[in-house]
Amino acid sequence: MELEFLGTGAGQPSKQRNVTSIALRLLDERNEVWLFDVGEATQHQLLKSNTRSRKVTKIFITHMHGDHIFGLPGFLTSRNFQGSELIDGGKPTDVTIYGPAGLQQYVFSVLRAAQVRLQYRINFIQVRPGIIFEDQQFAVSAFPMNHGIEDYAYRVVEKDTVGQLQVEKLLKLGLKSGPLFGKIKAGEIVKLENGLTINGKDFLGPDRPGRIIAIVLDTKDTPEIIKAAEQADVLVHEATYGAENSIMAKRHGHSTSLQAAEHARAAHAHQLILTHISARYLGKMADQLVKQAKNVFRPTYIAHDLEIFDIPAKKSERKDKIDVG
């Protein structure tokens, strides 16, 4: 699992930072990539990256401001020309797009006006607060933000992986590998031929706890941020302004780097990555954003375009239960 920052700027592109897009690379977990926002020129950024458009299966849009969506029609079109990952004997993979009201109309209007005919299907899911996607491996929840427009943060929860089957313990009971092992690994209660009844859970190692990623972009302070980021392994948080511009940040519906750190600390997050940086913060000025945050929350980093952060799998069992909602 990796986070690649395709664009880390705020409002408009600069020479140092393109506008917002984040790729959650789940190549080892499910051979997929999920995008969070698709700012203008995201497809150009992908050309500089090892992330392939054909791997993108889900796109999560936080809100309908241009610096977060103007790259979406172009990305969908270039994905069409570059070819999709083929499944089921040649059928291109579909893309599911999650976002606020008006997103589907926007995308289809642009594609229709440009006479684009996609070789794959786009499925639109209008976001509401709560769980918006869930399967046996992951759950994604949306939390309403405070930005003067319909806006969401996203919480990605990887579900715990069942512990490994302790084969040696079973062999000591005289059992041989076969279908019975499958039932035991599923945690079922099994009656053996010798009359002994065993609980499959007693023959499993500890579960491997899943990872939690929180994506909190354009917003000013709201209690929903803490809910979205609760015990996140990585909290990605906008930091458009420094603490010295807190009044301006509030006026424009944004956060400061100091506020991002306060949110990370309150949510008991493990790591904070700052993004959505205003073009006014260059060089040492950008370093000041990190310094302000580190005074409150030490494990803070600032993202740069095309930078990749690895999120390693956990080895120890998490003692507390994490709510995916």
Curated annotation (Swiss-Prot):
Task: Look up the record and name the cofactor or cofactors this protein needs.
Answer: Zn(2+)
Q: What does this protein do?
A: Zinc phosphodiesterase, which displays some tRNA 3'-processing endonuclease activity. Probably involved in tRNA maturation, by removing a 3'-trailer from precursor tRNA.
Name a GO molecular-function annotation: 3'-tRNA processing endoribonuclease activity
Q: Give the catalysed reaction(s), semicolon-separated.
A: Endonucleolytic cleavage of RNA, removing extra 3' nucleotides from tRNA precursor, generating 3' termini of tRNAs. A 3'-hydroxy group is left at the tRNA terminus and a 5'-phosphoryl group is left at the trailer molecule
Q: What is stated as this protein's family in its record?
A: Belongs to the RNase Z family.
**Per UniProt, where does Zn(2+) 2 bind?**
D67, H68, D218, H276
Q: What are the alphabetically sorted keywords of the record?
A: Endonuclease, Hydrolase, Metal-binding, Nuclease, tRNA processing, Zinc
Q: Which InterPro entries match?
A: Metallo-B-lactamas (IPR001279), RibonucZ/Hydroxyglut_hydro (IPR036866), RNase_Z/BN (IPR013471)
Cited Gene3D superfamilies: Ribonuclease Z/Hydroxyacylglutathione hydrolase-like
Catalytic residues identified in the record: D67
Report the gene name.
rnz
Q: How does it assemble?
A: Homodimer.
What EC number(s) would the UniProt record show?
3.1.26.11
Q: Which SUPFAM superfamilies match?
A: Metallo-hydrolase/oxidoreductase
KW Lyase (keyword) present: no
**What HAMAP family does this protein's entry cite?**
RNase_Z_BN (MF_01818)
Q: Which domain of life is it from?
A: Bacteria
Cofactor note from UniProt? Binds 2 Zn(2+) ions.
Q: Where does Zn(2+) 1 bind?
A: H63, H65, H147, D218
Q: Which Pfam families match?
A: Lactamase_B (PF00753)
Is tRNA processing a UniProt keyword of this protein?
A: yes
The protein's name: Ribonuclease Z
